[in-house]
Amino acid sequence: MSDRYELFLTCPKGLEGLLLEEAGNLGLEEAREHTSAIRGVAEMETAYRLCLWSRLANRVLLVLKRFPIQDAESLYEGVLEVDWFEHLEPNGSLAVEFSGNGSGIDNTHFGALKVKDAIVDKLRQKDGTRPSIDKLNPDMRVHLRLDRGEAILSLDLSGHSLHQRGYRLQQGAAPLKENLAAAVLLRAGWPRIAAEGGALADPMCGVG
């Protein structure tokens, strides 16, 4: 694999411009806006930096492969060709997320099943050991997006959605996700206000 990787960062719709600026400041290059996402290239160090410091992204996806598909079998074969031993031990756990439709795949559950089957079949080639499925806390989370006959296969570097920072084990329900709250502050010019010595009090800030 090369030293630079294609990355997709997902976000709530309408925050693409803010995320584009934030990700550029964190080192993402050749960044472009998409619907509810941005796309760019970066070294792995930058990918980890985005996972750690982005306040606006939901997920950071590292693109492993793009390939055309005509039907479910070509989807399976395309995923099977990836060297999954580089990413997961045969006795590890995985979760698969699938979005999009077309090329004979009109059900996301069926598409995810074909992706899962290909990964499992690849990993059990060595000695028959196969990974388990864990949708809550997998060792590897894979995402495949189907767009007009092209499959975009990615590793989810962020695990859980990045708005779930998890530093508080007990929390009450909040009206805003943390990344959306951060976007509201940016739109309101809070960084400038704070730099000028301004103060902010929010007695209903949820997890902060």
Segments the model singles out, each with a brief description of its role:
Residues L153-P191:
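SAM-dependent Rossmann-like transferase core, predominantly class I methyltransferases
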Residues G100-G102, E150, L157-G159:
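Short, flexible active-site-adjacent loop segments at beta-strand->alpha-helix junctions, enriched
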Residues V142-L153:
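C-terminal edge-of-domain segments
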Residues F110, K114, A118, N137-D139, ...:
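Residues forming well-ordered secondary-structure scaffolds
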Residues V96, L144, V184:
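A residue-level signal for conserved active-site and pocket-lining positions in enzyme catalytic cores
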